[in-house]
C-alpha cells in the first residue's frame, strides 16, 4: 500500500486501534429522506460529536453535511446508487467518480456490489475499474458487498458472507463491508478468508439497543475491524450516545454491559 492510502486511511480509522466506526448516510437515494437523516448536517453533527470515525455521503450531500466546526470526522463519498422504487433495485450503477470525490475533499470512496443479482456482471466490472482508479490516486476504497439475487436463499449464510468478503479483497478494496452472520464463530469464516479489514453492516433497524451492541461485540470477537452501521445509529434515541457506546466495544474492548451503561 502506498503512503497516500495509508495517510487517508488514518482519517477514517482510529490510528491507535486500527479499528473504525463508519456511519453510512447514503440512504436518501435508495429510500428518500428517512428518519434520522432528514437534516443531514444535524445527523453528521450528532455522530461526529459521539466519536464516529467517518460518514458515508453521496456527492450532493457533502456541502449540505459540512459543519465547518466541532469535532472532525472522515468523509467517504459513495459512488453507487439505485432506488427502492426500481424493479431491479439490487443493480447498482456508478453515479460519481473517484476524481469528483477527490475534488469534494473525500478521505475515501465506497462502492456497493450485490453478487448474485442480475446486474452482477456490470457491478463487478465497475468495481474493477474503480479499484484501478483508486490505486492511481491513492484513494482508499470501501467495498460494500452483499449476496442478493435469485440463487441467494439467505444473505447471512456464512459461506455467502465469506464469499462477499473475499470478492472485496480479490477486486482491490482496502476495507470490505459485509452482513454479520449472527455469531462470532461463523463470522470468522469471512475474517479468515479476507486479507483486508472486514467491517459489519447494520442491516434493518433492530428492536433494542442492547441487541445492536451484542452484534457489534460478536463481530469484534470474531476479528472484525469495526462497523459500518447506519439506521441503528442515526435512528437511535441518542445517536451520539450510541456511537460512544459502540466506541467502548470497538476501540476499548469493553463489554456490552459496560457500553450499555452509556445508553441508560
From Swiss-Prot:
* EC number(s) reported in the record: 2.2.1.10
The answer to whether UniProt assigns keyword Transferase to this entry is: yes
Q: What molecular function does GO assign, one term?
A: fructose-bisphosphate aldolase activity
Q: Could you list this entry's UniProt keywords, alphabetically sorted.
A: Amino-acid biosynthesis, Aromatic amino acid biosynthesis, Schiff base, Transferase
The Swiss-Prot or TrEMBL record describes its family as follows: Belongs to the DeoC/FbaB aldolase family. ADHS subfamily.
Oligomeric state and interaction partners are given as: Homodecamer.
The protein depicted here goes by the name: 2-amino-3,7-dideoxy-D-threo-hept-6-ulosonate synthase
Amino acid at each position: 500500500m502506498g503512503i497516500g492510502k495509508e495517510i487517508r486511511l488514518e482519517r477514517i480509522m482510529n490510528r491507535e486501534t486500527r479499528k473504525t466506526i463508519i456511519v453510512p448516510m447514503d440512504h436518501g437515494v435508495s429510500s428518500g429522506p428517512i428518519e434520522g437523516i432528514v437534516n443531514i448536517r444535524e445527523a453528521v453533527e450528532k455522530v461526529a460529536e459521539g466519536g464516529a470515525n467517518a460518514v458515508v455521503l453521496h456527492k450532493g450531500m457533502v456541502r449540505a453535511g459540512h459543519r465547518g466546526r466541532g469535532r472532525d470526522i472522515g468523509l467517504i463519498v459513495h459512488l453507487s446508487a439505485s432506488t427502492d422504487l426500481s424493479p431491479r433495485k439490487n443493480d447498482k450503477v456508478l453515479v460519481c467518480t473517484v476524481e469528483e470525490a477527490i475534488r469534494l475533499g473525500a478521505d475515501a470512496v465506497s462502492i456497493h456490489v450485490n453478487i448474485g443479482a442480475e446486474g452482477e456482471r456490470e457491478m463487478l466490472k465497475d468495481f474493477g475499474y474503480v479499484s484501478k482508479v483508486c490505486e492511481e490516486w491513492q484513494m482508499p476504497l470501501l467495498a460494500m458487498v452483499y449476496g442478493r439475487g435469485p440463487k441467494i436463499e439467505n444473505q447471512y449464510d456464512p459461506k455467502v458472507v465469506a464469499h462477499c468478503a473475499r470478492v472485496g479483497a480479490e477486486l482491490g478494496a482496502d476495507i470490505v463491508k459485509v452482513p454479520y452472520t449472527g455469531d462470532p464463530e461463523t463470522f470468522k469464516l469471512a475474517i479468515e478468508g479476507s486479507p483486508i479489514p472486514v467491517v459489519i453492516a447494520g442491516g434493518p433497524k433492530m428492536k433494542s439497543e442492547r441487541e445492536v451492541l451484542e452484534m457489534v461485540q460478536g463481530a469484534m470477537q470474531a476479528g472484525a475491524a469495526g462497523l459500518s452501521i447506519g439506521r441503528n445509529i442515526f435512528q437511535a434515541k441518542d445517536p451520539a450516545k450510541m456511537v460512544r457506546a459502540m466506541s467502548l466495544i470497538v476501540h476499548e474492548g469493553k463489554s456490552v454491559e459496560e457500553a450499555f451503561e452509556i445508553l441508560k
